[in-house]
Regions:
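Conserved N-terminal structural module of periplasmic/extracytoplasmic solute-binding proteins
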Residues: 4-16, 22-113, 323, 327, ...
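Mature extracytoplasmic/periplasmic domains
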Residues: 37, 114, 122-123, 288, ...
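Extracytoplasmic "Venus flytrap"/periplasmic binding protein-like
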Residues: 72-138, 173-175, 269-271, 278-279, ...
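Hinge/lid segment of periplasmic solute-binding proteins
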Residues: 109-162, 189, 197-199, 295-299, ...
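Extracytoplasmic/periplasmic solute-binding protein
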Residues: 149-157, 162, 172, 186-234, ...
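Glycine-centered hinge/linker elements that transmit conformational signals in sensory
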Residues: 190-194, 232-261
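Periplasmic-binding protein-like
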Residues: 213, 295-316, 366
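C-terminal capping/gating helix-and-loop segments adjacent to ligand/active sites or protein-protein/ligand interfaces
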Residues: 372-428
Length: 433
């Protein structure tokens, strides 16, 4: 789903436009004048795929999918109108919510659901429709991760799926264990120590990507995974699992050094492509560029941990006529259909939400190098010992940013790790109060 394999998911999703929102019960109130007068109604769908085909081919693929749905329903009483937005879709959402409304249909592009929209009951609960139409497998991870208090307010048709990428040639030169051999955290740190000894090579770039290691350590234990299953609390922050994860990541980052700390994954993409670093923390969407160099291979994190989140996606207003709501739900069904989900995998280059799609089988039969590598990367994630959601998806952007800042700062040689762990815990406790 990304414009550039070097982009992190956060940057990539921002390029598709950031937004948020959701909540509520079905209602036919607040109909427009045209709806009341019998004129053809318009169902507006806001999305961020505004880019030209030459700038980002994926955007054209997505627009074609939307246009196909519009044509298939052109003879109905409701016109489906996709609206590409070159800007921040959050502004559209915020303005609507401020006036007690919500866009007819909007793609959250991975962003969290608006609590204000939930509280005002502005967004439709999608779970009844999903259950009635047996779409549980089609929506996949969304059914579990996006279900809050028995309701599902948003469904993302493609998943934010993270493993990592490594240069097998560098690992061979270093005699280091490859990711498939990282049974413990020590296996990982020892491999990184080995690749640092190769002339002209550093292990990995940190900064924003460092939070993937914290995410991983929590995912390696049952207690840590339990922390990732709910809101961040004072007790969670003070827990042994949380503090130990901070301590272990900070210690490793300090060994890795401050020279390659700071920024997002984009800051280290060029070095990885040129063989100057051994590991690149990025998602499965990177397959397109990785396929150009056979030395660059996908892997998952220590202890067989992978990271995958549904995040926000198709979100529907609860304040529409029954006809508009019906078409909106048909659009949800269409975007999570096997036919469309196969295109999401093969043409968009993303991990489809639909559990019915056998990406491994499709990849093995394909002659396309990118599809083959993408299938390999996604299959590794699906077969991981543990799959955990992202920190930002579970605990929000503020906590996500605070942890990244703390981890980045810990890379400096003069930082006292124990003091940094305590200071980070204090900052996080102040954020949740």
């Amino acid at each position: 789903m990304k414009k550039n394999f070097f982009k992190t998911a956060i940057v990539g999703l921002a390029s598709i436009a950031l937004l948020a929102g959701c909540g509520g019960q079905s209602s036919s109130g607040n109909n427009s004048t045209s709806e009341k007068s019998g004129e053809k109604q318009v169902l507006e769908f806001y999305h961020g795929y505004h880019h030209s085909e030459s700038e980002w081919p994926v955007a054209k693929v997505m627009r074609d999918l939307y246009d196909k749905f519009a044509k298939e329903h052109a003879n109905g009483n409701v016109e489906f109108k996709p609206i590409p937005v070159n800007g921040d879709l959050k502004d559209i959402m915020k303005n609507k919510v401020a006036s007690g409304e919500f866009p007819d249909v909007i793609d959250l592009a991975g962003n969290a659901v608006s609590l204000a929209a939930i509280e005002q009951q502005l967004v439709l609960d999608l779970k009844p429709f999903i259950d009635e139409n047996n779409l549980q497998k089609n929506v996949g991870l969304n059914y579990e991760q996006n279900q809050k208090d028995g309701k599902i307010y948003t469904v993302h048709e493609q998943l934010f799926t993270m493993g990592l990428w490594y240069n097998k040639e560098i690992f061979a030169k270093a005699g280091a264990k490859t990711p498939d051999q990282w049974k413990t955290w020590s296996d990982f740190t020892e491999a990184m120590a080995a690749v640092r000894k190769v002339d002209g090579v550093y292990a990995y770039g940190t900064g924003e990507p460092s939070i993937r290691l914290f995410n991983t350590l929590l995912g390696m234990s049952e207690a840590g995974r339990k922390l990732l299953s709910g809101p961040l609390t004072k007790e969670a922050i003070e827990s042994k699992e949380f503090s130990e994860a901070l301590r272990m990541v900070m210690t490793e980052l300090q060994v890795n050094g401050s020279k390659n700390a700071g920024g997002d994954a984009n800051a280290y993409s060029k070095d990885f492509a040129e063989g100057k670093s051994a590991v690149f923390f990025n998602g499965v969407w990177a397959s397109g560029e990785m396929a150009k160099n056979p030395n660059l291979q996908p892997g998952i994190y220590p202890g067989g941990v992978a990271i995958s989140s549904s995040g926000g996606g198709i979100t529907i207003s609860s304040k529409m006529s029954e006809e508009k709501q019906k078409l909106a739900l048909e659009f949800l069904k269409y975007m999570t259909s096997d036919e469309v989900q196969k295109i999401i995998f093969e043409k968009v280059g993303a991990n489809p939400s639909d559990a019915n799609i056998n990406v491994k089988e499709i990849a093995e039969k394909s002659t396309d190098a990118t599809t083959k590598l993408l299938g390999q990367a996604i299959s590794q994630v699906k077969e991981a010992k543990s799959i955990v959601p992202t920190i930002s998806d579970v605990w929000g952007g503020d906590v996500h940013t605070a942890i990244i800042n703390a981890l980045t700062e810990s890379a400096a040689e003069n930082v006292n790790i124990e003091q940094k762990v305590k200071a980070t815990q204090d900052i996080l406790k102040s954020l949740i109060n």
